[in-house]
């Protein structure tokens, strides 16, 4: 995009710095918990191991989740500083599987985007998709299941156990 806009490397870096600061400010405003997410995580915690695999920057991820209290449900977090190639490449999920010392056949991914679903599939995972407002009209033909509500993830996990 920078090349198309004719931005120099310095202009690109200044733009990125401003963008990241504005994004961090937006994240600090909170209100990002998906309805039903905490109840679902609480129900799953005693039954399965969970980790987060995200393409988010580490600093942005921390801003989001320091205020939600949801990190207590997860063993580990894989963020964009932990792998070379981002989603839709499988690298983030392969790193997650290595950390858990589990095979893809023993896990599922829960995603909200085509890029995430593609990464999970390329890593050999079954992917359950719970689209968000921005992705609800996307094509998720590679999904193991597409759900309308995050609370329905519990039923899928129950079926697979």
Protein language model annotation of sequence segments:
Residues 1-10, 64, 96-97:
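Helix-loop "lid/cap" segments that line or gate small-molecule binding pockets
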């Amino acid at each position: 995009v920078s090349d198309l806009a004719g931005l120099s490397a310095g202009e690109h870096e200044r733009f990125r710095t401003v963008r990241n600061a504005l994004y961090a400010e937006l994240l600090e405003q909170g209100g990002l918990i998906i309805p039903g997410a905490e109840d679902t995580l609480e129900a799953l915690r005693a039954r399965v191991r969970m980790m987060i695999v995200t393409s988010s920057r580490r600093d942005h991820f921390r801003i989001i989740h320091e205020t939600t209290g949801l990190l207590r449900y997860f063993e580990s977090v894989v963020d964009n500083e932990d792998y070379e190639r981002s989603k839709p490449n499988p690298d983030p999920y392969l790193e997650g599987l290595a950390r858990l010392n589990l095979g893809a056949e023993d896990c599922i991914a829960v995603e909200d985007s085509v890029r995430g679903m593609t990464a999970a599939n390329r890593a050999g995972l079954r992917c359950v998709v719970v689209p968000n407002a921005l992705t609800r009209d996307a094509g998720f033909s590679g999904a193991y299941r597409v759900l309308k509500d995050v609370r329905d993830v519990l039923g899928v996990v129950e079926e697979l156990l």
